[in-house]
Amino acid sequence: MATPRLFRLKAEVAPAPSGPIAQSLPVAKIRVDTGVFHLDQLYDYIVPEKLSDSALIGVRVQLPFGGRETEGIITSRVAHPDRAGELKAITKVLSPHAVATEATLTLIENAAQLYCCNPWDLIRSAIPPRVASVDKSLSVVEAARTTQRSAASPIFHTFSPYLPSHRQMVDLVHGVKRNGSVLIIAPDEHDVDLLVGVLSAAFENVFPLTSSLSREDRYRNYLELQRFPLSIIVGTRSAVFAPVNNLATVIIYKESSIDHCEVRSPGWNTSTIAKLRSDNEGVSLIYTGFSPSLNSAYEIDHKKMKFVSQRFQVEARAFSPSEGALLPGRIFSEIKKALNNGAVLFLAPRKCSFVRSLQKCCALRLWWPFSCCF
């Protein structure tokens, strides 16, 4: 028979006292990572005096919520709470560096309302995870400065069909960089690498910001954005939320690419977020590509977006098929000659289709019939 064990009394663990309350603005409104979709409001917490100097807007903090310790971001400091009753206190400041500005937090709040989601779902995409070693290696600086500007109509800048698009970005960035920092959003990491390569050769303070970087490099670059008054940031989707110091221009590179759409919930789009940011902060917004997307074409047709394009002349020739061959034999000599002047594009219709008449093309307008193209 087993010997019964003695009962042990469980000792109640009381929370450690937080000490005296901060004398100036003792209440912090915090965006808490609740883990629950419908608990998306701001919560009031007491700021202890010992944390008052470091508990600033945009700083990560640890706090008690629902019987556990979780993470939050301070959105503001106020003198009095919105509700009566006893408030819990912030446990500790996780990082001395501000990872978001007031403008960034406002952008996330507006985007959450637009996409009907919990703001923390956007924060996970917008702000990279904390790395303690990087926090210790960098000195604390003032949060990124946001210069209020008058918002202008967005612009669509068309690329020349003769040159690689990433090389054409050098002249475009050179024209807008005199106004302040530039944020470029590219569809994928390959485009980011190409852009960083050509821009680093022409400008200083060029920072990549993608998920393909190591956690240390991504977090370090994210914090470095707030240290330079004039910089160029090249990143993928999540970089559209980055707190850039003295931001003047946002450029959406290849804006018709499907990679600008976030595949995870809530499925936001960089063009939409960039438009919200342009309206909130008054930064210039430039879309680029060889041709506008359907949404941009609608904005251009209704005079809501300025269309900037040079006149390009492309020589087009048609060759009839010979002996059922997909590509006629005499076409190859023409291709070799044209390669001396630039890139060559040739199109071959399917067997069941017809050769389109470019003079009668309706540009695939969304109405029926399409007989004008044949």
What are these regions (language model features)?
Residues M1-R356, C361-L364, W368:
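Accessory, non-ATPase domains that flank or precede helicase/AAA+ motor cores in DNA-metabolism machines
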